[in-house]
């Protein structure tokens, strides 16, 4: 039995940067708060909590003053920065550069089309931290769509500008883009004049899709390691499952079922851009040490 970890799996640079910033700040001995889970992986959140990172939500942020708060890679809406200013909160800003660039693009688009009664549409997960930050650039006027059913939120009589959450699947984005184009045409509008789309998916994420397709085909079984909250994890696991029916999603090694693996199987281990390498190594060690039928 071979048990191989995908060399392309593990943190994207945005998550790696945020975790490094958190560890550097905690090394000074000063208290550090983080607005939301620093990464959508409960095992890593737990590891950093043991080092002293205190996770807070937006309601708790409103009660803080004179302290340090980390902004995670997902980014934040403008009101978070305003609140920090008012309450003398020092922000340690670990917003991913790719997300910040997207926020700026969305704000520029919104400023350009708002007077023309146009609509900013975001293909993403409602309530996701990154989407909250992006929608905040439009004063929360952006329309968030996740499924085809959500297209009914859009007024196809008015211009539409489409963006994507950076961690969504490329396939899903282009499917949504085609559906919107069709609906604009059905409304009797000129598609070129009334619809603009922007593929704002992070290339480190989209490049993982073809890599994972290839990786998944090379093994009898694929164990995909990710936090259940990870949007990117759900998308990439879907890619594995398309290519290899014997792909399984776990948060850690304790979730592996005995029936999944046979003694003669070659096993591939991979994960989301929010999955730490140490966790995949833990899964690898567990499989190698276990007796399989």
UniProtKB/Swiss-Prot annotation:
Active-site residues from the entry: 130 (proton donor)
Keyword terms, alphabetized: 4Fe-4S, Iron, Iron-sulfur, Isoprene biosynthesis, Metal-binding, Oxidoreductase
Chain's gene name: ispH
Residues annotated as signal peptide: none
Organism: Cytophaga hutchinsonii (strain ATCC 33406 / DSM 1761 / CIP 103989 / NBRC 15051 / NCIMB 9469 / D465)
Binding site for isopentenyl diphosphate: 40, 74, 128, 230-232, 274
Reaction catalyzed: isopentenyl diphosphate + 2 oxidized [2Fe-2S]-[ferredoxin] + H2O = (2E)-4-hydroxy-3-methylbut-2-enyl diphosphate + 2 reduced [2Fe-2S]-[ferredoxin] + 2 H(+); dimethylallyl diphosphate + 2 oxidized [2Fe-2S]-[ferredoxin] + H2O = (2E)-4-hydroxy-3-methylbut-2-enyl diphosphate + 2 reduced [2Fe-2S]-[ferredoxin] + 2 H(+)
Cofactor note: Binds 1 [4Fe-4S] cluster per subunit.
GO MF assignments: 4 iron, 4 sulfur cluster binding; 4-hydroxy-3-methylbut-2-enyl diphosphate reductase activity; metal ion binding
Binding, [4Fe-4S] cluster: 12, 96, 202
Cofactor(s) required, per the database record: [4Fe-4S] cluster
PANTHER family: 4-HYDROXY-3-METHYLBUT-2-ENYL DIPHOSPHATE REDUCTASE
Catalytic EC class: oxidoreductase
Pathway this chain belongs to: Isoprenoid biosynthesis; dimethylallyl diphosphate biosynthesis; dimethylallyl diphosphate from (2E)-4-hydroxy-3-methylbutenyl diphosphate: step 1/1; Isoprenoid biosynthesis; isopentenyl diphosphate biosynthesis via DXP pathway; isopentenyl diphosphate from 1-deoxy-D-xylulose 5-phosphate: step 6/6
Annotated EC: 1.17.7.4
Gene Ontology annotations of biological process type: dimethylallyl diphosphate biosynthetic process; isopentenyl diphosphate biosynthetic process, methylerythritol 4-phosphate pathway; terpenoid biosynthetic process
Name assigned to this protein: 4-hydroxy-3-methylbut-2-enyl diphosphate reductase
Residues that, per the record, bind (2E)-4-hydroxy-3-methylbut-2-enyl diphosphate: 40, 74, 128, 166, 230-232, 274
